[in-house]
Amino acid sequence: MKRIGVLTSGGDSPGMNAAIRSVVRKAIYHGVEVYGVYHGYAGLIAGNIKKLEVGDVGDIIHRGGTILYTARCPEFKTEEGQKKGIEQLKKHGIEGLVVIGGDGSYQGAKKLTEHGFPCVGVPGTIDNDIPGTDFTIGFDTALNTVIDAIDKIRDTATSHERTYVIEVMGRHAGDIALWSGLAGGAETILIPEADYDMNDVIARLKRGHERGKKHSIIIVAEGVGSGVDFGRQIQEATGFETRVTVLGHVQRGGSPTAFDRVLASRLGARAVELLLEGKGGRCVGIQNNQLVDHDIAEALANKHTIDQRMYALSKELSI
C-alpha cells in the first residue's frame, strides 16, 4: 500500500487533530503518501481531497476540533453515494482509508469495506459509546470540561443555597453524566441506561435538606430528558430554589487533555499499521491500556454498556 486517506466524520471531538497528525506522520515515516479528505463523507463524494505533508500536521496536536472539518452526509448512506465515494478514492489512487469518528462514521467505513475498499475505524466521539474500546478520543477532555463547570456551579450553588440541574451530552450513552457526576460529587445522576423514579429523586433531595444540606447538584444526560423540565419539576415538588445549566456544545471544544493526545496518537498509528498489514474492515481501541482491534461489523453489532459497578458506586456515595 503506497497511498492512504484519512477523514473525520460526524460530531467533532478534542483529539481528532492529534489522531490525524499520528496517521500522517506514521504513514510518511513508512514511505506511504497520505491524502486528507475534507468535510467527511460529503467531501469524499465531492472529491474534496488533498495530499498532506508532515508540515500540514505541525502544531495541531494541542488544538480541538479537526483541521479536516467534518459534516454529516445522508447521501453516503445510499448505495449510489458509497459508489461515488469509492470512485473518488480510486481516482486519487488511494488504497486504504482511516476513518475517525463515532458510530455513524463506522457504519460508513463498514459499507466501504463491504464494497471491497479497506478501511480502519478510529473511535473519535466525546460520548464514549463505541464498543470495543474502554475510551474514545475526546471523552476525557469533555469530562474535564464538565467537571470544571460542576465545580464552578457548586460554588454559586453553595453561596445561594440552591439546587442546580446540569444537563450534559449523551443521547444514548450516560458516560459523561456518570463519570462527571461521580468526579464532581453530584447528589443525583440520571442516565439513559438506568430507570429512575422522580418521586425517589425528590424524596432524596428532601432528606438531604432535612439534615441540613441546603444545596444539591443533579447531573442529567440529555437522553433522559430536558434539564429545564427536571428543574421545573424539582422546584414545584420541593419548593427549593432551582436553577438549570445546559452545557451544550462547549463540551465538544477545547484543547485536548494529555490523555486524549496520547490515546489519539496511539490509535492513529495503529490504524496505519493495520492498513499496511493488509487488514481492512477493522476498528482500533484500547482495553486495559492495551491496543486492540476488532472486526468493524462485529463491533457495530455489539451495544455499548455502562459500567454498572461505577453506577452502583455513584448511588452509594450520593446518600
UniProtKB/Swiss-Prot annotation:
> What is the enzyme's class at the highest EC level?
transferase
Tell me which species this is from.
Geobacillus stearothermophilus
Q: What does this protein do?
A: Catalyzes the phosphorylation of D-fructose 6-phosphate to fructose 1,6-bisphosphate by ATP, the first committing step of glycolysis.
Kindly state one GO CC term assigned in the UniProt record.
Answer: 6-phosphofructokinase complex
Q: How is its activity regulated?
A: Allosterically activated by ADP and other diphosphonucleosides, and allosterically inhibited by phosphoenolpyruvate.
Has keyword Isomerase? no
Q: Which domain of life is it from?
A: Bacteria
Residues binding Mg(2+), per UniProt: D103
Name by which UniProt lists this protein: ATP-dependent 6-phosphofructokinase
SUPFAM superfamilies linked to this entry: Phosphofructokinase (SSF53784)
UniProt family annotation: Belongs to the phosphofructokinase type A (PFKA) family. ATP-dependent PFK group I subfamily. Prokaryotic clade 'B1' sub-subfamily.
PANTHER family tied to this protein: ATP-DEPENDENT 6-PHOSPHOFRUCTOKINASE, PHOSPHOFRUCTOKINASE
Tell me, in one coarse class, where this protein mainly resides: cytoplasm
Q: Which reaction does it catalyse?
A: beta-D-fructose 6-phosphate + ATP = beta-D-fructose 1,6-bisphosphate + ADP + H(+)
Identify the gene encoding this protein.
pfkA
Query: Pathway listed for it?
Result: Carbohydrate degradation; glycolysis; D-glyceraldehyde 3-phosphate and glycerone phosphate from D-glucose: step 3/4
Additional comment: In the R state the 6-P group of fructose 6-phosphate (F6P) is bound by His-249 from one chain and Arg-162 and Arg-243 from an adjacent chain. In the T state a conformation change moves Arg-162 away from the substrate. Glu-161 takes its place, hence repelling the phosphate of ATP.
Residue positions binding ATP: G11, R72, C73, G102, D103, G104, S105
Q: Matching Pfam families, A to Z?
A: PFK
Required cofactor names: Mg(2+)
Q: What Enzyme Commission number(s) appear in the record?
A: 2.7.1.11
Task: Give the record's keywords alphabetically.
Answer: Allosteric enzyme, ATP-binding, Cytoplasm, Glycolysis, Kinase, Magnesium, Metal-binding, Nucleotide-binding, Transferase
Fill in the subunit field for this protein.
Homotetramer.
Q: Where does substrate bind?
A: T125, I126, D127, R162, M169, G170, R171, E222, R243, H249, V250, Q251, R252
